């Protein structure tokens, strides 16, 4: 695996000699704007694999994306390769419909230590809950970013990530009650501990997420990609573009329902990916929000 090929894939041409917050932020921002958060393989009859060599080939050489266990593992490899002190952590995603965090450790995130300070770096949550910059690991501090205000809170060794969103404006009134829209401005995202993890700790969950009928990932095909102004999302046949802080502290969200013949073109032109096999889009049951 070639680190220069990774940097070319994400379009990163800046310095990688300084192991500082600016470099970490720059690499994270480049990856989330180049590598989609997506699970389309499993809706093309293919597996979402965890092997680093396979992930490198899939994302870097074949120009695809992946979910957190893939894109954050790739980010972990890149950061450690150039010398950042990086640790894998395991997260539990908040499920609004159940009003609780997942019982299984279904999310991979990273802790990066720079000059004695700890930061959370996560390139694998997607949609409008995706952080654009690393979050300093400080409890109770509001950390404003373009997507929203993020806040980390620690209670008895467990850390919680929340976000405070802006109001939303949806010009197409047909979608005002869409299940894809977050229902509140204050949203819980996930919880985690600082216990170091290895990728092997996620293997059984990686299988469960793409095979269990109770997994939201088996009923929902999704693809999201950050832009300098917002985020594109494709869930089933529904394409959205959210422009952050369009005006008056409000996000603008544009909706479009695609026909089957448009999906491949949208994936190529907006998300910059091409699939090797036919995609069967699935709309899900409201568990994925944009």
Curated annotation (Swiss-Prot):
UniProt keyword annotations, A-Z: Acyltransferase, Cytoplasm, Transferase
Residues that hold substrate according to the record: 106-107
EC number in record: 2.3.1.5, 2.3.1.118
Pfam families linked to this entry: Acetyltransf_2 (PF00797)
Catalytic activity: an arylamine + acetyl-CoA = an N-acetylarylamine + CoA; an N-hydroxyarylamine + acetyl-CoA = an N-acetoxyarylamine + CoA
Transmembrane spans: none
Alphabetical list of Gene3D superfamilies matching this protein: 3.30.2140.20
Key word Phosphoprotein present: no
Stored InterPro entries: Arylamine_N-AcTrfase (IPR001447), Arylamine_NAT_domain_sf (IPR053710), Papain-like_cys_pep_sf (IPR038765)
Binding of CoA, residues: 103-104, 208, 214, 287
Domain of life according to the entry: Eukaryota
Location of the active site: 68, 107, 122
Main localization, broad class: cytoplasm
GO cellular component: cytoplasm
Subcellular location as annotated: Cytoplasm
GO terms of molecular function: arylamine N-acetyltransferase activity; N-hydroxyarylamine O-acetyltransferase activity
Similarity comment text for this entry: Belongs to the arylamine N-acetyltransferase family.
Purpose: Catalyzes the N- or O-acetylation of various arylamine and heterocyclic amine substrates, and participates in the detoxification of a plethora of hydrazine and arylamine drugs.
Protein name: Arylamine N-acetyltransferase 2
Source species of the chain: Macaca mulatta
Lineage start: Eukaryota, Metazoa, Chordata, Craniata, Vertebrata
Protein's gene: NAT2
């Amino acid at each position: 695996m070639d680190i220069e090929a990774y940097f070319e894939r994400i379009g990163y041409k800046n310095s990688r000699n300084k192991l500082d917050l600016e470099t970490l932020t720059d690499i994270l921002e480049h990856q989330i704007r180049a590598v989609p958060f997506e699970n389309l393989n499993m809706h093309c009859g293919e597996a979402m694999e965890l092997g680093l060599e396979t992930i490198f080939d899939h994302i870097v050489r074949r120009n695809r994306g992946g979910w957190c266990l893939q894109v954050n593992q790739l980010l972990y490899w890149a950061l450690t390769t150039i010398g950042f002190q990086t640790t894998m952590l395991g997260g539990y995603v908040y499920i609004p419909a159940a009003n609780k965090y997942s019982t299984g450790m279904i999310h991979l995130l990273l802790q990066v230590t720079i000059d004695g300070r700890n930061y959370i770096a996560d390139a694998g949550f997607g949609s409008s809950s995706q952080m654009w910059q690393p979050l300093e690991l400080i409890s109770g501090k509001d950390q404003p970013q373009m997507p929203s205000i993020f806040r980390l809170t620690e209670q008895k060794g467990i850390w919680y990530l929340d976000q405070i969103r802006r109001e939303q404006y949806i010009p197409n009134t047909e979608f005002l009650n869409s299940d894809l829209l977050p229902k509140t401005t204050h949203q819980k995202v996930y919880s985690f501990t600082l216990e170091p993890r290895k990728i092997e700790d996620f293997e059984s969950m990686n299988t469960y997420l793409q095979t269990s009928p109770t997994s939201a990932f088996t009923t929902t095909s999704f693809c999201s990609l950050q832009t300098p102004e917002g985020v594109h999302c494709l869930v089933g046949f529904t394409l959205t573009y959210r422009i952050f802080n369009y005006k008056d502290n409000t996000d603008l969200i544009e909706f479009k329902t695609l026909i089957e013949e448009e999906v491949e073109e949208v994936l190529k032109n907006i998300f910059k990916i091409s699939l090797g096999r036919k995609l069967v889009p699935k709309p899900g049951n409201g568990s994925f929000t944009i």
